[in-house]
UniProtKB/Swiss-Prot annotation:
Active site positions: S702, K745
Residues where ATP binds: G379, P380, P381, G382, V383, G384, K385, S386
Any one GO BP annotation for this protein: cellular response to heat
Record's signal peptide: none
Function of the protein: ATP-dependent serine protease that mediates the selective degradation of mutant and abnormal proteins as well as certain short-lived regulatory proteins. Required for cellular homeostasis and for survival from DNA damage and developmental changes induced by stress. Degrades polypeptides processively to yield small peptide fragments that are 5 to 10 amino acids long. Binds to DNA in a double-stranded, site-specific manner.
Record text on subunit structure and interactions: Homohexamer. Organized in a ring with a central cavity.
EC main group: hydrolase
Chief location of this protein within or outside the cell: cytoplasm
Domain Lon N-terminal per the UniProt entry, residue ranges: 7-213
Protein name: Lon protease
Length: 795
């Protein structure tokens, strides 16, 4: 006995959905949108699709629809813009599973129906074979069809999802795929769908095909009679033959069509567009494959209705191909001296970075090849990565294109969307090439570390083809569908964190790290660039508003905490705005911004940099921290009280720093006698290590040497000079290991009033990154083992 089931129903207009056949539908009616919106939240996306009898009815009832439909699996739901900005329509893609008989609408929900599954039948196999042979005269063709249907079942896993008797599955697939090809009305297709018996279904398919063939034959026979149209046709033919002798057939037909329109007085904007495109193809050296593709699409465009969606989509595709640069090339400036001059003009500081950039580009300019690794500028926000890339483009006379990759999670953003999708377009790479209008621009791939993966694919994987010099001469965009040569493009990437760059991309990159600016560099940047830009934006000149070096330094120290200069620029803009208000309100004509004026306009200070203590106490030592905004002093406090030998860690210390504290204590215990500490003392006391600033998480191993020193100082009562700071990872054997952030730590220590720094010996090679004027004012002592520090401080 048939089983009645329930499902949501989607009523479609002008289309019959067959089982086993993929389909694509646009959903825009309010009732239908509601169904699809609810379906998006479900794991299994199935519903019944049925055709509406009368397309004009907006809210069809049970009698307005055919009662045989198809149970479908929805594979994809895409949001598309609605008819107005307040609505969202949908495009759905899926495939039919099995025919169903719709019994009634649900009483509780008009969008829900009761249905029964319909199975096909075979009454006479001889009839089935006879009809199949009418369509496919060769027996081998039928055998291949049956084998293909069986493979389709296996690949699509149909047998597990569709309740069809075993012997009928292949015949069902063949008949419904044939039915989908019938170029006929929906009523005839619906009749085919409703037919249960396979032989009868095949007969209807053949009949539908013959009817179309009959119309064509009837039309041909009617042309045998001489008519005025025939006479006109003969006249046109003679006229063209006089004008053209041995032209190609397609040109002959176009001329014929043009003269027909002249005879009846019709002019077409589309004709003008087509003529313009053909002229453009003739006059420009487009690649042959692209010319061929455009001409093919142009033929579709000519034959389509101007008001149809297909016409618009085809024209958009043609325009995309035409507007892409295929041969246009700008002339590069290969003068390395000009490159150095431009970088120095636009960027204060960053000497090592600029040196590496010049070395990297000098080779490429000499060889005229982009075969090396891609340059990737890595550094904190605001240190000038993007502006460096722009300066390189300026120096080389290259067109500059910036593509932001932050938050990109869909591979189609890089490769483009396939033309079958509504609203499809090329990916960001080819859209950037269209903006550049040349084949050799400079592409900035900004924030390459911010890409993410999702079920829409892996954009980082798509970028591999873009950046790999062995592959990018044949880059494939899903929308364009033709190979595009990116080998002449110079790519530069930027990132904030090197560890977030996908490994496969990292392997293809030349990493150039940008560190934070020093205070003096920030002052120079403000004087040479930021203040000038802020004054120009406010229509002021340097005579009306001036900034002293002390004022800029005060803003940097007490109102910003950043590696770059973005916040500094915002604060300068704020001062400028407040000055303009004062100028209009109080009649001020000019002003020099000093420290007092900064306090007046920016109010109370926001930050305080950590300064060394003025008085030394046992158990207090200056460590050195490296932060995303630069560096800072890291005071470490150790005290001990009577207890049971426990180690207490406070100050929001993370795992690595906690381990470092345990290693430091272990080293002190193992060498207690050497440090003049009674070993038995450790069992009688609890040691508390505290790092002030509990609201800020602290991590890393580089405070090891400072932790050992603070523990020894606390247990022996010996004080450490507050003008001393130290950094270095400690081991249980007392080795002082290399650390990072030498430049930032050294600058922050100097700013905090430190005069002597203990640093791992292997970090000496990084000291050239620190400004010479700071190094000259510090006593930097390089150590291999902790004993070197102990002998200097406590012996």
């Amino acid at each position: 006995m048939p089983v009645t089931k329930k499902s949501q129903i989607l009523v479609v207009r002008g289309q019959v959905i067959f089982p086993f056949v993929p389909f694509s539908l646009d959903v825009g009616r309010p009732r239908s949108r509601k169904i699809i919106k609810a379906l998006k939240t479900l794991k299994t996306k199935r519903l019944v699709l049925v055709t509406q009898k009368f397309t004009g009815e907006q809210n069809p009832e049970f009698n307005d629809i055919y009662h045989v439909g198809t149970l479908c699996e929805i594979d994809e739901i895409v949001d598309v813009p609605g008819v107005d900005s307040k609505t969202v329509d949908y495009r759905i893609k899926g495939r039919g599973l099995q025919r169903v008989l719709i019994e009634k609408f649900s009483d509780a929900d008009i969008n829900e129906v009761s249905y029964q599954l319909l199975n096909s039948t075979v009454k006479d196999e001889a009839n089935v074979d006879r009809f199949l042979q009418r369509i496919f005269p060769e027996k081998e063709e039928i055998e291949q069809l049956m084998e293909g249907a069986e493979k389709f079942l296996e690949l699509e896993n149909i047998s597990k999802t569709v309740n069809v008797p075993k012997g009928l599955k292949q015949l069902d697939i063949i008949t419904f795929k044939l039915a989908n090809l019938v170029p006929n009305t929906e009523s005839i297709k619906q009749a085919i769908l409703e037919e249960n018996e396979i032989a009868n279904r095949l007969e209807k398919i053949i009949q539908a095909g013959i009817e179309d063939l009959q119309k064509i034959q009837d039309y041909g026979r009617s042309k045998n009679k001489e008519t005025e149209f025939d006479k006109l046709d003969s006249k046109i033919t003679r006229k063209i033959n006089e004008q053209l002798s041995r032209q190609q057939r397609d040109f002959y037909l176009r001329e014929k069509l043009r003269i027909i329109r002249e005879e009846i007085g019709i002019s077409s904007k589309k004709e003008d567009e087509v003529a313009s495109i053909r002229k453009k193809l003739d006059e420009n050296p487009y690649p042959e494959a692209i010319k061929k593709r455009i001409l093919s699409e142009l033929e579709h465009y000519e034959n389509s209705s101007s008001s149809s969606q297909e016409s618009t989509l085809t024209k958009t595709y043609i325009d995309t191909l035409l507007n892409l640069p295929w041969w246009q090339k700008s002339k590069d400036n290969s003068d390395v001296k000009n490159l150095i001059k431009t970088l120095d003009k636009n960027h204060t500081g960053l000497d090592k970075v600029k040196e590496r950039i010049v070395e990297y580009l000098a080779v490429q300019l000499r060889t005229q090849k982009n075969k090396g690794p891609i340059m990737c500028l890595v550094g904190p926000p605001g240190v000038g990565k993007s502006s460096l890339a722009k300066s390189i483009a300026e120096a080389l006379d290259k067109k500059f294109v910036k593509i932001s990759l932050g938050g990109v999670h869909d591979e189609s953003e890089i490769r483009g969307h396939r033309k079958t999708y509504l609203g499809s377009m090329p990916g960001r790479i080819l859209k950037g090439m269209t903006r550049a209008k040349v084949i050799n621009p400079l592409f900035l791939l900004d924030e390459i570390d911010k890409m993410t993966s999702s079920n829409q694919g892996y954009p980082s994987g798509a970028l591999l083809e873009v950046l790999d010099p062995e592959l990018n001469n044949k880059f494939s965009d899903n929308y364009v569908e033709e190979d595009y040569d990116l080998s002449k493009v110079m790519f530069i990437a930027t990132a904030n964190y090197i560890e977030d760059i996908p490994e496969a991309l990292l392997d293809r990159m030349e990493i150039i790290e940008l560190t934070s600016y020093t205070e003096q560099e920030k002052i120079e940047i403000a004087k040479n660039h930021l203040i000038k830009r802020c004054l120009e934006d406010a229509d002021l000149n340097s005579e009306e508003l001036k900034f002293t070096d002390e004022a800029i330094s005060y803003i940097i120290k007490f109102y910003t905490r950043e590696a770059g200069v973005r916040q500094l620029e915002r604060l300068i803009q704020q001062v400028v705005r407040k000055y303009i208000v004062a100028m209009q309100k109080d009649g001020i004509k000019q002003e020099t911004i000093d420290v007092n004026a900064v306090k007046k306009y920016l109010k109370k200070e926001i930050f305080d940099h950590t300064m060394r203590d003025e008085v030394s106490l046992p158990g207090i030592v200056n460590g050195m921290a490296y932060t995303p905004t630069g560096g800072d002093l890291l005071p470490i406090e150790v005290t001990h009280v009577a207890g049971k030998g426990e180690l207490i860690l406070t100050g929001n210390l993370k795992q690595t720093m906690r381990e470092s504290a345990n290693v430091a204590l272990g080293y002190v215990k193992a060498n207690a006698e050497r440090f003049n500490i009674n070993p038995s003392l450790f069992k009688k006391i609890d040691i508390n290590i505290h790092v002030p600033g509990g609201g800020i998480p602290k991590d890393g191993p580089s405070a090891g040497a400072a932790l050992v020193t603070a523990i020894i100082s606390s247990l022996t009562g010996k004080k450490v000079d507050p003008t001393v700071a130290m950094t270095g990872e400690i081991t249980l054997r007392g080795k002082v290991l290399v650390i990072g952030g030498v430049k930032e730590k050294t600058i922050s220590a100097y700013r905090g009033g430190v005069t002597t720094i203990f640093m791992p010996e292997k970090n000496e090679r990084y000291l050239d990154e620190v400004p010479k004027e700071i190094v000259d004012k510090l006593n930097i002592i390089f150590v291999k083992e902790y004993s070197d520090i102990y002998n200097k401080l406590f012996s």
